[in-house]
Amino acid sequence: SKVDSFGIYNGDKTYYSLLGETDQEKKKAVLIEKGSDKIFVYKLSEGTSKRQAEKIAKKNGADAIDKVTFGYLNGRPIWEVKSGKSYYIVDFEKRKLLSKEGL
């Protein structure tokens, strides 16, 4: 197994976000809820890819993408795409934009 990226998602709760591969070369996302024993594991092949999330954000007004973080919001896995001062929340399972939030 190997970890390709690590991030921290701060939504209603904080999650440590890891993207990587298993020994069988299956790509997975792992979310660990801070201060809890809750761990969520997702097969990346079963939802929106990081690249698709960027494209969905751009279709909805994002310019240059600063950062993309896998996270968990309102009981569902999401991609948070940061562009400038705006955050685009893309549903991992439904492959669509859930919300756009600006600072």
Report residues per predicted region.
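Conserved histidines in hydrophobic membrane contexts and catalytic metal-binding motifs
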Residues: 9-39, 51-103
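Second-shell loop/turn segments in exported
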Residues: 40-44
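Short extracytoplasmic/periplasmic juxtamembrane "stem" segments immediately C-terminal to an N-terminal membrane anchor
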Residues: 1-3
